[in-house]
Regions:
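Cyclophilin-like peptidyl-prolyl cis-trans isomerases
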Residues: 2-172
Length: 172
């Protein structure tokens, strides 16, 4: 692992720690949308693969760049892109951090219970694993319940394989 990636992850941890409480539980699962008063239909995202692209995350402590894996998780990447273009994530914080495990964001309510009002299906790939720091994945509350919340791993978390859709990786 190069020092830039380590520094980025440390910066992310500090960013999150400055606005959230820490938990030290191990073996946890990132939590997804649990309650939404209004339910809306999922936009019509096809599962046709798309080209990988990049997203820049702006935080109070700087930027980081993520490669979005449209070739492996096209519905999830299209959903993320759709929400970004709608401004859904503007002003949203990383609301949950577990040291050595992950940071979680994407909840407009900041409580861990918010989401877009619809869910998307899981997309698993035999080529993608939670074997390193910097994996970007969709948080959920069970099979096929992803929405807007996502998390970035702070280390290997292999127990999450085939439980959360991996749709990107931190590259800078």
């Amino acid at each position: 692992m190069n020092w830039k990636r380590l520094a980025l992850c440390a910066m992310l941890g500090i960013t999150v720690l400055s606005t959230t409480a820490c938990s030290t539980k191990t073996g946890e699962q990132p939590q997804g949308n649990t309650v939404k008063a209004e339910t809306v239909a999922m936009p019509n995202f096809t599962n046709a693969p798309i080209a990988d692209e990049y997203a820049i995350f702006d935080t109070n402590y700087g930027q980081f760049k993520v490669r979005l894996l449209g070739s492996k998780a096209p519905i999830t990447v299209k959903n993320f892109d759709y929400l970004v273009k709608k401004g859904f994530y503007n002003g949203v914080t990383f609301h949950r951090v577990i040291e050595g495990f992950m940071i979680q964001g994407g909840d407009p309510d900041g409580t861990g219970a918010g989401g877009p009002g619809y869910t998307i299906p899981d997309e698993f790939s035999n080529d993608l694993h939670f074997n390193k720091m910097g994996v970007l994945a969709m948080a959920n509350r069970g099979p096929n319940t992803g929405g807007s919340q996502f998390f970035i791993t702070l280390g290997p978390t292999d127990w999450l394989d085939n439980k959360h859709t991996i749709f990107g990786t931190v590259v800078q």
